[in-house]
């Protein structure tokens, strides 16, 4: 029987590397001393990593791995079951469609349709989902899950336009005009709301009344069509913010554009909807609908041919002479007058405006020439609605040392146009109020100003043909020399020849002239031939200035109106009503209208 335990082999000469048992050592008592002893004698450093272990975000790594596996599985299923569209090859290249690797084989005819378990499973599932969505109760009231549809669709506006045409029976673009800018303003707006609460839509009929003069609302399920006319013009941004705050919706649930105001089908569409029981209407029908639908308004706008005489009469009655004033105000008048509307539709607006301005100037020029100076002054007083006091004129003349009686005597001869007394010169140092005093006088009498700077032009005196009083400011010595050499007849008050633009030289008497200067020509012997043709007043004192920088003496149209009304008898001015025994003259009429006050 063999001995149990370790068998000893007799290996002679090899006993040095065979260890039969552990040797006991008394020099090291504990395990720690043994570890310290071994570390001290070791030649390998940092063999053991004693740092704190960082676990990391293992859950995120696991989720990323799971997502990657799911994506790979879905991609494999899509490649397996989804068929590529047949037209994809033709869309890529028509020539590529002709290239075929496998030969063409005719498909076998089948008596019965395939069960679709293998090929048509995806198509059947899609068809089933569509049928379920169509059978839902929400689609019957026009609402549906329109929010989800709008979010999923690539073109939200196209989806909303299609739904609008399906629900309301008309294309949205046929009744609206597109504003490219959201900041363009309009009074009338067409607003379409998608997927809003019915209660909120009903309450909006009351809330919008404080903002609008006309409201037409038609609610179709969870959608609504608004035609509103605001009290003031609003932009698309303002309208969208207002509707979003009232209905608690988002901007993508809304279509907002102004209606076609000149479209008869658009007017008839909203006029028809206003009579339906489903529609709620507040306010009076807008004018753009009434003019195109109601018989009375259509009869009032039947005369669509433009008449220049009516335009001239309107400009004459409203005292519009400049071309810019006529063009702007007559365009605004198109909402009230058919002839102005026909003017806007005309392609010759510039010609009409130019002709109208020319005719009005001719009529006004003849009336001015036909009036005496007294009639003209009282006409200016009647047209001035401002009230004032004539005392600042008297106080200012007294401040400058001018006797009021002497001034009235000279002014009386000046207004009558007596020869040799047809020109008043006010001279003195600078800042004495000469120009302020004369400009206010010329403004009230609607005079014209000529400037010596334009002397090189042949027509620089032409403005004096259209006024009752002329004015030249700040005449220098060179200017006086020119007047002495060329314009003695103008100061005499006798007829002279004036070169006018686009016409033959005109023979007429120049109006009384008012001139300011810093030179006292009475002291200039070289201008002695002008001494008998002018009447001078000296303003030696500077104009007093208040603390705010304004002059102490101010002269307005009301001041001169009060001056002529107060001192009319002293100036020998006669009231036209007294000459006609209180009977007013007949107003001018250049068109065959029945009522002269219709404008």
Swiss-Prot record:
A cellular component term, taken from the record's GO annotations: host cell nucleus
Positions bound to ATP: 428-435
Post-translational modification: Phosphorylated.
Broad class of where this protein is predominantly found: host cell
A Pfam family hit: PPV_E1_N
Domain of life of the organism encoding this protein: Viruses
Localization in the cell: Host nucleus
Residue numbers spanned by region DNA-binding region: 139-303
Residue ranges with Polar residues bias: 124-140, 582-599
Domain SF3 helicase: 402-552
Molecular-function GO term, any one: ATP binding
BP-aspect Gene Ontology terms: DNA replication
Alphabetical keyword list: ATP-binding, DNA replication, DNA-binding, Early protein, Helicase, Host nucleus, Hydrolase, Isomerase, Isopeptide bond, Nucleotide-binding, Phosphoprotein, Ubl conjugation
Record PTM Phosphoserine, positions in chain: 84, 93
Residue interval(s) of motif Nuclear export signal: 92-101
Crosslinked positions (Glycyl lysine isopeptide (Lys-Gly) (interchain with G-Cter in SUMO)): 509
Keyword set includes Ion transport: no
Repeat keyword on record: no
HAMAP family, per the entry: PPV_E1
Family affiliation: Belongs to the papillomaviridae E1 protein family.
Protein name: Replication protein E1
